[in-house]
Swiss-Prot record:
EC number: 2.1.2.3, 3.5.4.10
Organism: Prochlorococcus marinus (strain MIT 9301)
Keyword entries, A-Z: Hydrolase, Multifunctional enzyme, Purine biosynthesis, Transferase
Family: Belongs to the PurH family.
Taxon lineage: Bacteria, Bacillati, Cyanobacteriota, Cyanophyceae, Synechococcales
Protein name per UniProt: Bifunctional purine biosynthesis protein PurH
Length: 517
């Protein structure tokens, strides 16, 4: 008896040549319904329609097509079970040997902004049911859920009877496919209706096995979405991205995004941003009237730490900028676009990883941030809210002048991306000293102020958290700091305010903290 394949696919890539091979090489009969049946019939492939096979018409506008005992009985019947054999004979079932199913494009539909009812109609019911039935009975039935599996299935079939390990692998991929599908639906409903869920479920396909993790003795894997984020970025040259590269690129790009992001020169004057990052901390940042100037200003902050770092831009990289980039050793450069001449200049550095990350590849706002802990996962909103300066409060007798306000705004945006406790010293829209990851705030201030040195005169200071004591203000005064920005909220805020008034320093409370761990 000829084997029977049930074929119902949304993604019709390679389905015609695959079905032809099944028929010509292995004498399969093809059972199909709806759009897939029409697609195959149009290609002159003989098809048994599901409605004829079950002797039941499609109903409810196509919502019910394959949900039938003749379909699921034919898939779920165990070939060596005597009771199953009797049921097959009694109910006149025909055994189905291969299930080829992929599902309605739910993710694509909702990503395109579909309305609620349209999205609901793109929730596949029959497809997942057939996939799960076949995967459960994988000892007797093979299940294919992706066009990438077709060729391998044909090759394995040519070897004779399919091995149990291969069929188990197909079952694993099938259950992962339906789990991914259900996850997309449940997360969409949660977000659309702004519901709190008792379970946190996400699904990411494997993108790549990385060479190693943070250290060579650690295994590492990269999972992610195919149509957004770093997996969709175009790597124009250089070695494969490492685990540490990806972490640093994420931090660097997140920082420059504070100042806008565009492939073309559409930024406001003096909003061309460049950030140099090392070990997940900015070691230099600037905004200026060109990408080239912004990079040079950022480099001045800490040229030693910049060696082997990551550089991010929020605008096109031109040849002037590329000339300066090629003069130092860098791991990666990321920007929304690159001039052809700039690429020619940078390509002399063959190991330099160059990434084009377009604006369209940026994730939507309001994503989640996760961290694993023993036996669990911590989930929070990402710290990407756009603050309104009108919500800030000047708490001192002296108000900051226009230039100081510009620098305070800049320093505050950079400080948000520095590991806590974080202090950033800025002047003329560039960082001149950064104190990162210290266990006490005054310690971070000492590092940042010492790094800036004599440049501190008339500079500003930003702190990601409040001052528990007035000692940071005293230290800032010793170096010539003229303005401070911090969240406020300490029980001893008044002591810091009084010290600022005594020393002639202006201070702003943002009323929002930006701890980063």
């Amino acid at each position: 008896m000829s084997p029977l394949a049930l074929v119902s696919v949304s993604d019709k890539k390679n389905i015609i040549p695959f079905c032809k091979e099944l028929i010509e090489q292995f004498n399969y009969k093809i059972l199909s319904s709806g759009g897939t049946a029409k697609h195959l019939i149009d290609a002159k492939i003989p098809v048994i329609k599901v409605a004829d096979f079950t002797n039941s018409p499609e109903i409810l506008g196509g919502r019910v097509k394959t949900l039938h005992p003749k379909i699921h009985g034919g898939i779920l019947a165990k070939r060596t079970d005597e009771e199953h054999k009797k049921d097959v004979e009694t109910n006149n079932l025909e055994l189905i040997d291969l299930v080829v199913v992929n599902l309605y494009p739910f993710k694509k539909t909702v990503d395109q902004g579909a309305q609620w009812e349209d999205a609901i109609e793109n929730i596949d019911i029959g497809g997942p049911s057939m996939i799960r039935s076949a995967a459960k009975n994988h000892k007797d039935v093979s299940v294919l859920v992706d066009p990438s599996q077709y060729q391998n299935f044909l090759e394995e079939s040519k070897k004779g009877e399919l091995k149990d390990a291969y069929k188990a692998k197909l079952a694993l991929e099938a259950f992962q496919h339906t789990a991914d599908y259900d996850t997309a639906i449940s997360n969409w409903i949660r977000k659309e209706r702004d519901l709190q869920s008792s379970k946190y479920i996400e699904s990411y396909p494997l993108i790549k096995t990385l060479r190693y993790g943070e250290n060579p003795h650690q295994k590492a894997f990269w999972y992610g979405l195919s149509n957004i984020g770093w997996n969709s970025a175009e790597q124009l040259q250089g070695k494969d991205l490492s685990y540490n590269n990806l972490l640093d690129l994420e931090s660097a790009l997140s920082t420059v995004l504070e100042f806008g992001y565009t492939e073309k020169d559409e930024l406001k004057t003096d909003m061309f941003a460049s950030v140099i990052l090392k070990h997940n901390n900015p070691c230099g940042a600037s905004i200026s009237n060109s990408a080239s100037k912004a990079f040079l200003n950022a480099l001045e902050c800490d040229s030693v730490s910049a060696f082997g770092g990551i550089v991010a831009f929020n605008s096109n990289v031109d040849s002037d900028t590329a000339v300066h980039l090629k003069d130092i050793f860098l791991e990666c450069v990321v920007a929304p676009s690159f001039d052809e001449e700039a690429l020619e200049i940078l390509k002399v550095k063959k190991n330099l990883r160059i990434l084009k990350f377009s604006k369209d590849q940026l994730p939507k706002k309001n994503q989640n941030s996760t961290k694993s802990i023993m036996g669990g996962l911590l989930v929070q909103d990402t710290d990407d809210s756009q603050e309104k300066t009108e919500d800030w409060i000047s708490v001192t007798n002296k108000n900051a002048n226009n230039q100081a306000n510009l620098d305070l705004n800049f320093a505050w945006k950079i400080c948000k991306h520095v590991k806590s406790n974080a202090i950033v010293i800025a002047k003329d829209q560039k960082t001149i000293g950064i104190g990162a990851g210290q266990m006490n705030r005054v310690g971070a201030a000492k590092i940042a102020l010492k790094a800036a040195g004599s440049l501190c005169s008339d500079a500003v200071l930003a702190s990601d958290g409040f001052f528990p004591f007035a000692d940071t203000v005293e230290l800032a005064h010793e170096y010539g700091i003229k303005a401070i920005i911090q969240p406020g909220g300490s029980l001893r805020d008044q002591e810091s305010i009084d010290m600022c008034n005594l020393k002639g320093i202006s201070m702003i409370f943002t009323q929002k903290r930006h701890f980063l761990h």
